[in-house]
UniProtKB/Swiss-Prot annotation:
Cofactor(s) this protein cannot do without: Mg(2+)
Family: Belongs to the P-Pant transferase superfamily. AcpS family.
Keyword Transferase: yes
Catalytic activity: apo-[ACP] + CoA = holo-[ACP] + adenosine 3',5'-bisphosphate + H(+)
Classification of source organism: Bacteria, Pseudomonadati, Pseudomonadota, Alphaproteobacteria, Hyphomicrobiales
Keywords, ordered alphabetically: Cytoplasm, Fatty acid biosynthesis, Fatty acid metabolism, Lipid biosynthesis, Lipid metabolism, Magnesium, Metal-binding, Transferase
Name of the gene encoding the protein in the UniProt record: acpS
The protein's name in its UniProt record: Holo-[acyl-carrier-protein] synthase
HAMAP family documented for this protein: AcpS
Species for this entry: Methylobacterium radiotolerans (strain ATCC 27329 / DSM 1819 / JCM 2831 / NBRC 15690 / NCIMB 10815 / 0-1)
GO CC annotations, alphabetized: cytoplasm
InterPro entries per record: 4-PPantetheinyl_Trfase_dom, 4-PPantetheinyl_Trfase_dom_sf, ACPS, Ppantetheine-prot_Trfase_dom
Binding site for Mg(2+): 8, 57
Length: 136
């Protein structure tokens, strides 16, 4: 069953300006070490950060909290499955909120779709609760 849906659009130009103005102060506040390493080794650095920023916003919406109620930017990390498919790893307040959304005997599966078509980046997040025997 679906327990949360979120989407977000992010202007890549805004992220590029923020990177120019605030650099590491911005990236260290919003992104995990792994996300920074992945984005910083690419030529399209702003696009990578914008996709991840949109994913975090979409996840916060899917959790039903936004970036409040103890959910912080770095509680949500965009990672890739072995197949290359993006997903989210949650920690701290985001993981706690996710646990509150799940019915007893269910585990979460987070579905993430990321795209960009400059100047915009977009993300969708769906939180699915699956019975533990199926989620395995």
């Amino acid at each position: 069953m679906i327990v949360g849906i979120g989407s977000d659009l992010c202007d890549i130009r805004r992220i590029a300006r923020t990177l120019e103005r605030h650099g590491a102060r911005f990236t260290h506040r919003v992104f995990t070490d792994g996300e920074r390493a992945r984005c910083d080794r690419r030529a399209a650095r702003a696009e990578g950060y914008a996709r991840r920023f949109a994913a975090k916003e979409a996840c916060a919406k899917a959790l039903g909290t936004g970036l409040s109620a103890g959910v912080f930017w770095r509680d949500m990390e965009v990672v890739n499955l072995p197949s290359g498919q993006p997903t989210l790893r949650l920690a701290g307040g985001a993981a706690e909120r996710l646990a509150e959304l799940l019915p007893a005997g269910h585990a979460a599966r987070l579905h993430v779709s990321l795209t960009d078509d400059p100047p915009m980046a977009q993300a969708f997040v769906i939180i699915e609760a699956l019975p533990v025997s199926v989620a395995g």
